[in-house]
Amino acid sequence: MSLQGLMMKRTLLCWPLSCLFVLLPWPLATPTPITPWLCPPGKEPDPDPGQGTLCRTCPPGTFSASWNSYPCQPHYRCSLQKRLEAQAGTATHDTMCGDCQHGWFGPQGVPHVPCQPCSKAPPSTGGCDESGRRGRRGVEVAAGTSSNGEPRQPGNGTRAGGPEETAAQYAVIAIVPVFCLMGLLGILVCNLLKRKGYHCTAQKEVGPSPGGGGSGINPAYRTEDANEDTIGVLVRLITEKKENAAALEELLKEYHSKQLVQTSHRPVPRLLPASPSIPHICPHHHHLHTVQGLASLSGPCCSRCSQKWPEVLLSPEAAAATTPAPTLLPTASRAPKASAKPGRQGEITILSVGRFRVARIPEQRTSSLLSEVKTITEAGPSEGDLPDSPQPGLPPEQRALLGSGGSHTKWLKPPAENKAEENRYVVRLSESNLVI
């Protein structure tokens, strides 16, 4: 052989050796199949195959429904779509959703479509007309076993309560304004009645009892206080009438105006101890125009004369103890009248306001013909009145009756047979005569 042939053989032998030396530093690779392995339904590939197992069971809450090499998928949550669970999920089956929850509506047969609230539903929606009577689809398959022998978990039977009670809300919204309007209307009517003079009260007025109607006693004459005296009852009965109160106010105003005129045009008078009594004149320090005792001097007229009708009357004993001496103011233009009627003989003045005078007559037993007389006469006579001229030779009682003049009417009370009489009172007001 030639030398060239030997060189070619030597080159062919060195080529595999050089390739071997090049591949020796690389790590040895394990043989792998061309396609990955597949796991059965209910299992997923094991990420750690060191235990000798290539697949593992799906964890709770997940499932795998076919042969594949993917991990298990979580179960579907029906509550997110406001639906009820018709069948609970297993390792090989997903959760099956049923009808919509109470208060929600949605298309039937499409479990993965979310439900809508009934407040947005049309009037003829089938799911919202029934209140609380909503069936659950797939309840019959909630129990038992599956086709492959695995036990089925019972479905969730709870229902979401309806948060919207539209009927009750509408009723409350309608009732509250009605009550408010009724209250405002009642207040308005009460104010209108008060302006017209009526009295609005929330309590029922107690009327006369059925049994007390036949007593024949006028309720106006029934005293509220058992200790109230006769003068108090008389004054209360007079002042209860609006007409009498207005008349007394007019008399007081007229009396005050006359006093102001007299004091403004006349000098300070000088007191005469022997003159008869004039009820219009106020001696200031010793008068009983009011029932509070002696009054202090305040200007031309005492402060007690400026007051209106008193509230409490003076007792007859105090009035008798503090009766002032009669006085008279002389005037240059007009002489004092001789016909001015002083108090009757034996009378004790109780109250004197203007021309209104209340006096007390003590009991008199000297005469058997007349026991007592009650009259209402004028406190101050007119210009044309004549002085009293009682006839001589008559008893004192008849003189008292005849002393008032012929123009006034007298009523005589026949004597009571063997009956003790109590103190009587005389009320004199203006120019009218009246017997009580």
Curated annotation (Swiss-Prot):
Keyword Amino-acid biosynthesis: no
Subcellular localization: Cell membrane; Cytoplasm; Cytoplasm, Perinuclear region
Signal peptide (from-to): 1-31
Region Disordered: start-end pairs: 123-163, 324-343, 379-420
Short sequence motif named RFRV motif, residue ranges: 355-358
Family membership noted in the UniProt record: Belongs to the RELT family.
Protein name, UniProt field: Tumor necrosis factor receptor superfamily member 19L
Cytoplasmic topological segments: 191-436
Coiled coil feature spans: none
Residues exposed to the Extracellular side: 32-169
Post-translational modification note: Phosphorylated in vitro by OXSR1. Phosphorylated by STK39.
Any one GO cellular component localisation term in the record: nucleolus
Entry's transmembrane regions: 170-190
Disulfide bonds: C58-C72, C78-C97
Expression sites (tissue/organ): Expressed in the teeth.
Membrane topology: Single-pass type I membrane protein
Extent of the TNFR-Cys repeats: 57-97
Entry keywords, A to Z: Apoptosis, Cell membrane, Cytoplasm, Disulfide bond, Glycoprotein, Membrane, Phosphoprotein, Receptor, Signal, Transmembrane, Transmembrane helix
Residues modified by glycosylation: N156
InterPro entries in alphabetical order: TNF_rcpt_RELT (IPR022248), TNFR/NGFR_Cys_rich_reg (IPR001368), TNFR_19-like (IPR022333), TNFRSF19L_N (IPR034048)
Ranges annotated as biased composition (Basic and acidic residues): 130-139
Low complexity biased stretches: 324-336
